[in-house]
């Protein structure tokens, strides 16, 4: 059963994987309390839509929780769409 008390701190970091047929980009959100993956998206080319989809998954799963989200300052996290999702959901 999921509980809100451990969703106080979440971490986010894009990771590039080199594969036989090219690169893959993983964008997960991890609960820093128990290392559970809250949401993720995997794409062949990094783009702002990847971050938007991952954040929509996270918001649906958090169901009203308002955690603190740690991320680097990469270009994906500077996009207005990403920042709007955070603002609209009190994250």
From Swiss-Prot:
PROSITE patterns membership: INTEGRASE
Domain of life: Bacteria
Pfam (any one): rve
GO molecular function, a single term: nucleic acid binding
GO biological process: DNA integration
Domain Integrase catalytic span(s) in chain numbering: 1-91
InterPro entries linked to this entry: Integrase_cat-core, RNaseH-like_sf, RNaseH_sf
Signal peptide from the UniProt entry: none
Descriptive protein name: Uncharacterized protein HI_1280
Phylogenetic classification of the source organism: Bacteria, Pseudomonadati, Pseudomonadota, Gammaproteobacteria, Pasteurellales
């Amino acid at each position: 059963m999921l509980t809100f008390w451990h969703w106080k701190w979440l971490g986010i970091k894009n990771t590039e994987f080199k594969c036989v047929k090219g690169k893959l980009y993983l964008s997960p959100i991890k609960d820093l309390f128990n290392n559970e993956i809250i949401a993720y998206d995997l794409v062949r080319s990094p783009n702002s839509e990847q971050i938007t989809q991952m954040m929509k998954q996270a918001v649906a799963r958090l169901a009203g929780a308002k955690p603190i989200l740690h991320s680097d300052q990469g270009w994906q996290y500077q996009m207005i769409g990403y920042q709007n999702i955070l603002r609209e959901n009190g994250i």
